[in-house]
From Swiss-Prot:
Membership in a protein family: Belongs to the SfsA family.
MF term (GO), any: DNA binding
Gene name for this UniProt entry: sfsA
InterPro entries: SfsA, SfsA_C, SfsA_N
HAMAP family: SfsA
Organism: Caulobacter vibrioides (strain NA1000 / CB15N) (Caulobacter crescentus)
Protein name, per record: Sugar fermentation stimulation protein homolog
Length: 239
């Protein structure tokens, strides 16, 4: 997927009120950018970190700049939580995810359960429907290990329960973690920061929900879902 061009490099000054980030661009300009990530952003919000923003000339926008990526060590980390669904939609349309290939229709944002919407519903006349939930993952504090979540994620835990209910109805249900970085080979639920989610993921898997984790190929011009990585059930690290 091509990113808004051109991405502009700078350094973070602060991220605040969830959706705002102050930066100093390489040309010395001080800006405030929209931060499309309501989470804790552990490891990718520190003053002085290199960052990449996009610029828009849309007059309806309050902020012309959007924070897209942050540099953590040698890794380029995508922080835009809106991007994974777009990446998955692109991959599904291209039949690029072998575990999710061969469906006749792909419907985004389908209402189900009492008050939930699933990210994608995949259907085929000869198969049970497949309910697909997508989760963004950027968090890594141990070399090679991606973790989710980086804060309490009650809504995500509820999504796992909803997916389990679909399995009980005879449907297929999948949770797909999209890791927006290249430097991770394994994935684990972060039990230290959200034990309820970690337990919920294990319970969902036992109930028949499929867990997929894909890492991205990151660049300042394009990002794409690139390769599947291992879900490590018992890999727990101290905070």
């Amino acid at each position: 997927m091509l990113l808004p061009q051109p991405l502009i490099h700078g350094r973070l000054v602060s991220r605040y009120k969830r959706f705002f980030a102050d930066l100093v661009l390489d040309d010395g300009q001080e800006i405030t950018a929209h931060c499309p990530n309501p989470g804790a952003m552990l490891g990718v919000k520190d003053a002085g970190q290199g960052a990449w923003v996009s610029w828009s000339d849309d007059p309806k926008r309050k902020l012309a700049y959007t924070l897209q990526m942050v540099e953590q060590g040698n890794a380029l980390v995508g922080i835009n939580t809106l991007l994974p669904n777009k990446l998955v939609a692109e991959a599904l349309a291209a039949d690029a995810l072998p575990e999710l290939s061969g469906y006749a229709t792909i419907k985004p944002e389908v209402k189900y359960a009492e008050a939930s919407r699933v990210d994608f519903l995949l259907t085929h006349p000869d198969r049970p429907p497949c309910w697909l939930e997508v989760k963004n993952c950027h968090f890594s504090r141990t070399p090679g290990l991606a973790e989710f979540p980086d804060c309490k994620a009650q809504r995500s835990t509820r999504h796992l329960e909803d997916l389990s209910a679909q399995v009980r109805e005879g449907h297929r249900a999948v949770v797909l973690f999209v890791v927006q970085r290249e430097d991770c080979e394994t994935f684990s639920a972060c039990a230290e920061l959200d034990p309820a989610f970690a337990a919920g993921l294990e319970a969902a898997a036992k109930a028949g929900v499929e867990v997929l984790v894909y890492a991205c190929e990151m660049g300042t011009q394009a990002v794409r879902i690139a390769r599947r990585i291992l879900w490590s059930h018992a890999h727990l690290t101290a905070i």
